[in-house]
């Protein structure tokens, strides 16, 4: 099959991570994956949720939103609806889980790190881009806190990144754009650590089924892409 921009089946879109994109957050980036653009920021709050009070542990949580003009037809702000959608809630939880898996939260002290992900332009893979970019914003924030003497060490146990994979017309492909995602027989989001361990696998078939062999192919593709993303994260962070 021929892909947009004549990408190979195992080739990601061009990814850029621009650190320090905002003035006020403790850490921020703009991540671009092809035409998808997500602004990720990290800000510290000197308290934790009630269930963690007095336990000497920190917390990492995330919020996610689509700007109205990020999509081809205007997306209504969820604030004007009075509640967030199930999709938004799912993505927020996914981002938070992915980051907490690699953070030593007792080393944070009783503080909450808020991650905000705002999609400026959506062309597929916004949740995976949000995870990949948010990790860099989180690391930058922790680095700042260590330099300021707020924490003793950078409480990060491993790197984390995410990518989409799918099957179209029987062909496994890496990093789906929206036009590909909308016609995929199988669509999957994969979150992995730098050590190659899995944090989350979200995969579904539409109107068909997929085999164990195809699942293994997809996970192999995802692992390749995620290692490339983590190499980029390390370059940006200078580690």
From Swiss-Prot:
Keyword tRNA processing: yes
Keywords attached to this entry: Nucleotidyltransferase, RNA-binding, rRNA processing, Transferase, tRNA processing, tRNA-binding
Gene from which the chain derives: rph
Enzyme class: transferase
HAMAP family referenced in this protein's UniProt entry, alphabetically: RNase_PH
Catalytic activity: tRNA(n+1) + phosphate = tRNA(n) + a ribonucleoside 5'-diphosphate
Similarity field: Belongs to the RNase PH family.
Binding site for phosphate: 87, 125-127
Superkingdom of source: Bacteria
Function of the molecule: Phosphorolytic 3'-5' exoribonuclease that plays an important role in tRNA 3'-end maturation. Removes nucleotide residues following the 3'-CCA terminus of tRNAs; can also add nucleotides to the ends of RNA molecules by using nucleoside diphosphates as substrates, but this may not be physiologically important. Probably plays a role in initiation of 16S rRNA degradation (leading to ribosome degradation) during starvation.
Species of origin: Syntrophomonas wolfei subsp. wolfei (strain DSM 2245B / Goettingen)
EC number: 2.7.7.56
Gene Ontology terms for molecular function: 3'-5'-RNA exonuclease activity; tRNA binding; tRNA nucleotidyltransferase activity
Record protein name field: Ribonuclease PH
UniProt record, GO biological process: rRNA catabolic process; rRNA processing; tRNA processing
Key word Ribonucleoprotein present: no
Assembly and interaction partners: Homohexameric ring arranged as a trimer of dimers.
């Amino acid at each position: 099959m021929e892909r947009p921009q004549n990408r190979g089946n195992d080739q990601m879109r061009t990814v850029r991570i621009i650190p320090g994109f905002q003035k006020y957050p403790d850490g921020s980036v703009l991540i671009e994956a092809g035409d998808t653009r997500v602004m990720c920021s990290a800000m510290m709050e000197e308290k934790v949720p009630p269930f963690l009070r007095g336990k000497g542990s920190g917390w990492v949580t995330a919020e996610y939103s689509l700007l109205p003009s990020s999509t081809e037809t205007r997306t209504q702000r969820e604030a004007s609806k009075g509640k967030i959608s199930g999709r938004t809630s799912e993505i927020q939880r996914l981002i938070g889980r992915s980051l907490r898996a690699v953070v030593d939260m007792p080393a944070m002290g009783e503080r909450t790190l808020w991650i905000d992900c705002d999609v400026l332009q959506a062309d597929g893979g916004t949740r995976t881009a949000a995870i990949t970019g948010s990790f860099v914003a989180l690391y930058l924030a922790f680095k700042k806190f260590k330099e300021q003497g707020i924490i003793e060490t950078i409480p990060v146990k491993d790197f984390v990144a995410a990518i989409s994979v799918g099957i179209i017309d029987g062909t496994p492909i890496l990093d789906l754009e929206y036009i590909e995602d909308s016609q995929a027989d199988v669509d999957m989001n994969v979150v992995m650590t730098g050590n190659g361990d899995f944090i989350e696998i979200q995969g579904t078939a539409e109107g068909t089924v997929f085999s164990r062999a195809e699942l293994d192919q997809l996970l192999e593709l995802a692992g390749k892409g995620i290692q490339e993303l983590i190499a980029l994260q390390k370059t940006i962070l200078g580690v």
